[in-house]
Amino acid sequence: MPPDDPPAALDPGGANAIGRMLGLLGDEWNLLILQQALMGAGRYSQFMSRLPISNSVLTKRLRMLVDEGLLTADYATTARSRSLWPVLLSIWEWERVWVAEHQHRLPAMRHAQCGELFSPVLRCAACTAPVGGEELEFAVGPSGQWSRSAPSATTRRRSESEDAARQAGLFPQTMAVLGNRWAAALLVAAFLGTSRFTDFQTQLGVPPSVLTERLQTFCDIGVLTATAAGQSERSAYRLSGKGRALAGVLITALQWAQRWFVAPDGPAMVLRHRGCGKTLTGELACDRCGNRLCGAQVDVTEAAAAGIP
């Protein structure tokens, strides 16, 4: 795919950008393959040697990524996959800050432009103020009907292949909230304000047993908190501080999806920055010099451990 390849035009009334994002990024193997591709893997044998993956699973995922324009026919990265760097950088920063076992082993990031070790800051491109989950207003866009956003793949039991993918991941907690279609859809719904079990089930069409498992996982890792107003009322599931901190991951993933998968009736989700009142275009900036980041200017001390190209 050439660098100036246009975005994919989605079918009217079909899956929207969120649905396409969940289908591509809401899959542990896809994330791991893309991670390795951005770190230099470009041959089938390299993916096989770096990941505990079977030939059949690798062949299927590579075919999907080629068909979706994230890899070329010879497994080189494309503009579409290279533009995922803000998502990966946001994942890295969230795990560094919020997952205790990572705090002393993740390598530092250096901003080549200013030469300083830095942390990425999500900010509003219009007013340049830092933004987090509490400063954002998430609203359903013209193409944002849940029937078009929810995962299209049928659910299935977790297989040994999926367990191997999770064990291979450098960021297991992120995989728990993004590396599965239903989990990623649940995260989107939570940011849109959904909090009741029945509302999650109705909006997403997720089987009750799967929803129960995902909600429990989100609570176990501290992304959601479950509260009940009274003994007769069912729990409400709300984003914790750790959950709201996933705004950077979600926003960069949504912006990537809505850049590359365009519905004729408009975006699936519209974000507004409460601070300035403008529609949000998020960007990552260096917390040391304040300049906007670009992928080519981010250096890491140990690229293999970082998972960032």
Residue ranges and their predicted role:
Residues 2-22, 151-175:
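Short, Lys/Arg-enriched N-terminal segment that forms or immediately precedes the first helix
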Residues 62-63, 215-216:
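Short, hydrophobic-biased segments on the C-terminal half of alpha helices
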Residues 66-74, 219-229:
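A short, conserved structural fragment
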Residues 26, 74-90, 94, 231-252:
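Basic, amphipathic "hinge/linker" alpha-helix immediately C-terminal to the N-terminal HTH DNA-binding motif
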Residues 96-163, 262-309:
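C-terminal regulatory/oligomerization modules of transcriptional regulators
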Residues 68, 93-99, 221, 256-260:
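Alpha-helical linker/hinge and terminal dimerization helices associated
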Residues 59, 212:
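Conserved catalytic core of two-component sensor histidine kinases
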Residues 16-54, 169-210:
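N-terminal helix-turn-helix DNA-binding core of bacterial DNA-binding proteins
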